[in-house]
């Protein structure tokens, strides 16, 4: 076992604080509308340029192991805030730095670290309750666009695109961000349920101008097995032919004689049919077939539940207004499924999302919810260069997370104002003893730090503006973009309540642990010279040749 280096008390805390400050100072320059860029060196390709706090934090590893421990603990604050709300990472880092700095000063002055932590925790609980009182619901497109704009570093086009996407696919719908091919940002909306499976034969194509199959008011046959024998399909095909409607077959696979017969019937115009493979694999395929069944008010023909393909009737088939199939995708538009059944299926999948422990499974389940709930929107980010594209995509991702958080828990005044108002509201809070009162004051002082940093980054004097904001009431604050005072919500400067709350809670949690640290242990660096000397001693083995 390697020898360890151990530091105690103030020696440990000074090193840890140095690491905290290095990471926080690198991250906090990005805060606010006039935040600066940080350039990150990459092992290959062009350097990355970012204004995203968590991207900066993730890059930092320090040479001194004790300093690095401090930096990594603050990195955890940024990561946790990012995971919980998708934004607010820089705010969380600034809060954590302030609490740690002020808290360690109090420890050095002889305060009890445990009581300090209890005081900080009390202040945060009271502050979160006050934040909820200040919160305003965020449901209309204008406020959603404003939140998106602020989170994308005052880029109005991004805010408008996100609001438009939410209008089209609903608050629960899936919105994804991709790298586009042009210079402009674009929004691409797929209505209805789309899955990644195309036609099984190009002979099904009935719209040669765009190489697609379009079926109007079709029946939909869902089968949980391979179909290779046409005899199994005949009863369904005869029923559909009598009804004079087209048919879409979704099965594990359609092959051989069955596929050939379907193609011949389609080309002769006897029955208009198209066949596609079912989406997904294994259990996920079964689940997605059931989703399609609920959406189209049909049944999945599966021998597991005693339904045989030969005995299937028109009542077992689903229906939709329109289906469009191309080489790679199938889109079912306006399925005739009952609304209550669809809602029940969505809530069932939402329950699975809550219970899921795998990020991949959770993502796939969320995709299924979106497909049932209303559609998928894709924001395609445009930029002139690859470096700009990557930076912009990260900002759009942040903005999307922030708007989701705003819809979930509402919004508060932005620009650091909400935390200043919260600190003023809990000014009468008292702890069980004087050390706890100091902890409460440490937390309250930290709540001013984001406002001060935003002002500092904009090139103004933090103390002057912080005092002016504190003298005001309600949503009165400082707009760093226009350098004017006024009502922050009226000016469209909003922060999601969830983002502000998460930033404060995670910052206080990890900063509290750092204040109560008394000992730090790390591996001693290995002495490479000693290792080389030991290896050099093996040279004498060459003399063993004489043993022969």
UniProtKB/Swiss-Prot annotation:
Keyword tags: ATP-binding, Chaperone, Cytoplasm, Isomerase, Nucleotide-binding
Residues binding ATP: 30-33, 51, 87-91, 415, 495
GO CC list: cytoplasm
Gene that this sequence comes from: groEL
Subunit (UniProt): Forms a cylinder of 14 subunits composed of two heptameric rings stacked back-to-back. Interacts with the co-chaperonin GroES.
GO BP: protein refolding
Presence of keyword Chaperone: yes
Family recorded in the similarity comment: Belongs to the chaperonin (HSP60) family.
One Pfam family, short name: Cpn60_TCP1
CDD domains with a match to the protein in the record: GroEL (cd03344)
Entry's EC annotation: 5.6.1.7
Biological function: Together with its co-chaperonin GroES, plays an essential role in assisting protein folding. The GroEL-GroES system forms a nano-cage that allows encapsulation of the non-native substrate proteins and provides a physical environment optimized to promote and accelerate protein folding.
Catalytic reaction(s) noted: ATP + H2O + a folded polypeptide = ADP + phosphate + an unfolded polypeptide
Protein name in UniProt: Chaperonin GroEL
GO MF annotation terms: ATP binding; ATP-dependent protein folding chaperone; isomerase activity; unfolded protein binding
PROSITE patterns: CHAPERONINS_CPN60
Organism of derivation: Photorhabdus laumondii subsp. laumondii (strain DSM 15139 / CIP 105565 / TT01) (Photorhabdus luminescens subsp. laumondii)
SUPFAM superfamilies: GroEL apical domain-like, GroEL equatorial domain-like, GroEL-intermediate domain like
Annotated localization: Cytoplasm
